Amino acid sequence: MNGEFGMRPRAIVLLSGGLDSTTCLAWAQARYECMALSFMYGQRSTTELDAAKAIAQNAGVEHRVINIDLANLGGSALTDHNIDVPEQLQEGIPVTYVPARNTIFLSYALAAAEVFGAEAIVIGVNAVDYSGYPDCRPEYIQAFTNMARLATKAGVEGKPLTFETPLLHLSKANIIRLGIEHGVDYSQTVSCYQADAQGRACGKCDSCRLRKQGFIEAGVTDPTRYIPQ
């Protein structure tokens, strides 16, 4: 990107390669000049990152990948292969929660926004059809927004960043409908917590369950490639 965007307002979009973040990118492109930001953080399945690279390329946006070794800490089924990804619903915060992940990701996005002069950060957190992660709640986003006002040059100078959460109060079905309206090709996306090397989904984890149900409720054919059972 070389530090330059076009003439439209600028935004950093967190892009995992999954359904929600890809919908966010399409939504953001209708409003902003976008840079997509992804993370290699030691996640169990890296095919989502392959998907993110392809999605960003097809969308024609600059894409940066940040390397962080959260697997060195473990503490989650997504970063520790000794912890199984559950295939049944769990009470409380599930073992697929990665400690402080959104805080870490948003902090990098905040730095990128300052460096590249972005006015907004777009993240696909959702508090309706989600797995119960504490860093996907409205009060978390508000708290991070308040922190960013205090911790950044832009905030101190009276030009605080906007944190856009277009999916926050949408059901998975309505997220899919929004993406379809913006031309999203969901066959490119990978949502599964334990997708195989070809990006095929297990069809059993919580992320797969929410995704499957979303397509059913949206009345849209599910383009997901599943591992043969």
Swiss-Prot record:
InterPro entries: QueC, Rossmann-like_a/b/a_fold. Its EC number is 6.3.4.20. Pathway: Purine metabolism; 7-cyano-7-deazaguanine biosynthesis. Its cofactor is Zn(2+). It catalyses: 7-carboxy-7-deazaguanine + NH4(+) + ATP = 7-cyano-7-deazaguanine + ADP + phosphate + H2O + H(+). Keywords: ATP-binding, Ligase, Metal-binding, Nucleotide-binding, Queuosine biosynthesis, Zinc. Binds 1 zinc ion per subunit. GO terms for biological process: queuosine biosynthetic process. GO terms for molecular function: ATP binding; ligase activity, forming carbon-nitrogen bonds; zinc ion binding. HAMAP family: QueC (MF_01633). Belongs to the QueC family. Catalyzes the ATP-dependent conversion of 7-carboxy-7-deazaguanine (CDG) to 7-cyano-7-deazaguanine (preQ(0)). This is 7-cyano-7-deazaguanine synthase.
